[in-house]
Amino acid sequence: MRLIVTKNYEEMSKVAAKEMAEDIKRNPEIVLGLATGGTPVGMYKELIRMYNEGELDFSKVTSINLDEYVGLSGDHDQSYRYFMNTNLFDHINIDKNNTFVPNGLAENVEEECMAYDARIQDIGGIDLQLLGLGANGHIGFNEPGEALSVGTNLTDLKESTIEANARFFDSIDDVPRKAITMGLGGIMKAKKIMVIASGEGKAEVVKAMMSGKITTEIPATMLQMHRDVILIVDEDAAKLLK
C-alpha cells in the first residue's frame, strides 16, 4: 500500500485527480470505479478543470459507481446518479450511456444486484477503483458486521452512516435506510484501488486501514490484502500514523 500525505484537502484533491488523469491518459478506454460523498468533490472539480484545459479526454471512458440509495430516482437531488451528473458527468465529454449507477427504484433488487455484477464482468472489470472512507470504516456501503458480502447487495445502513449523511438532506428522517452497494468482492477485483480521506474524523480509520487487524468490523482493513492500493490523505487524516 502506497501512502501519500498532503497538506490539506485541496492538495489531496489535486494529487488524487492527477493520479487518475495519468491512468486515463495511459488507457483512454479505462473502466473507472467512482465514489460519491463529500470527499471526492474537489477531485472531480480538478478533473473538470483538466478537461476544460484540454488535458483529458473522457470520450472512451466507462464508469461504474459503487452504490445508490434504495427508493430514490436518478433525478432526485440526493441520489448518487444525480450527484455524479452534477459533480462530474455534465461537465466532461463522457458518454452517459457508458456511466453506470445501481437503479435505486428497481422492482426486484436481487435481480438488479446480479445484473450489476454481470455488467462489471461484461465490460472487463474495473481498472481503477476510487474509494472514500466512512468514519466507521465502511467502503461503498459495506458496513461493519460479522460478515461482508462478496457481490453487489442490498444493505441496511448503520445509524452512524445515516447520521453522517443527514447533512445532505432536509431532515435525518429523509435519509434512506437501505442502499444497493457493490460488494467487497467486486471492489477487491479492481486492478488498482485509490483511497482518499480528509480530516481528523477519518484519522482512526486511516490508521486501522494501514496497520490495524484485518476484520469485517472495519471493512477498510480488507484493503490490506489488495496488491495495488494508493492511499492519499491530508495531514489531519494522517495524524495518527507514525
Swiss-Prot record:
GO terms for molecular function: glucosamine-6-phosphate deaminase activity; identical protein binding. Pfam families: Glucosamine_iso (PF01182). GO terms for biological process: carbohydrate metabolic process; glucosamine catabolic process; N-acetylglucosamine catabolic process; N-acetylneuraminate catabolic process. This is Glucosamine-6-phosphate deaminase. It catalyses: alpha-D-glucosamine 6-phosphate + H2O = beta-D-fructose 6-phosphate + NH4(+). It is an enzyme of class 3 (hydrolase). Pathway: Amino-sugar metabolism; N-acetylneuraminate degradation; D-fructose 6-phosphate from N-acetylneuraminate: step 5/5. PANTHER family: GLUCOSAMINE-6-PHOSPHATE ISOMERASE (PTHR11280:SF5). GO terms for cellular component: cytoplasm. It comes from the Bacteria. Its EC number is 3.5.99.6. NCBIfam families: nagB (TIGR00502). Gene3D superfamilies: 3.40.50.1360. The active site is at residues 67, 136, 138, 143. Keywords: Carbohydrate metabolism, Hydrolase. Catalyzes the reversible isomerization-deamination of glucosamine 6-phosphate (GlcN6P) to form fructose 6-phosphate (Fru6P) and ammonium ion. Signal peptide: none annotated. InterPro entries: Glc/Gal-6P_isomerase, Glucosamine6P_isomerase, Glucosamine6P_isomerase_CS, NagB/RpiA_transferase-like. Belongs to the glucosamine/galactosamine-6-phosphate isomerase family. NagB subfamily. It comes from Clostridium perfringens (strain SM101 / Type A). HAMAP family: GlcN6P_deamin (MF_01241).
